[in-house]
Amino acid sequence: EQTIESIATAGYTSILCIVTSPFYSMIGTGAYERKLHSILRAYPDISCEIIKSWWNRPQFFEYWRSQLMAANPLQADTACIFSAHSVPTSTVGSYEDEVMSASNQIAKMVGLNHWYQAWQSAAPYGEWLGPTIESVIEQALIDGAKRIVCIPLGFVSDHVEILYDNDIICRNI
């Protein structure tokens, strides 16, 4: 609210909003969008454009391709696990398809024939999109993986919970 007030005070009449999640979800991006529109009702002179998703941009794919290639993912004993934020199954919409499509495209760019999809940060209540990254790592180890590469493509900025999950919890599995 303070940011919008500052924008109005400075005399701006147009804003462009980009959510740091590359994938649109009703519970994530949609919640920010609803909150913003609610605040903007008090500022009728400000127009707003929201970029709801941007996962399908070439730069997004190229970034993840280069990051993944740096991890040498094609070794026989390596399991590659793509992950994104989990959402309640009742609000999935196109979110799961977008994430799966991005994971598949990046895997093809790198030459992965087999990879896993996982979901992180589900709330402890209700039904959320799964499987969890922990259960996928366990499955990859059962399948013979000696090395795990996590590709958190749903998280494009440092996210304390995901850093903890991937750097501490997942390492101890």
Regions from the PLM with identified roles:
Residues 1-173:
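Extended amphipathic ligand-handling, pore-lining, and cofactor/metal-binding catalytic surfaces
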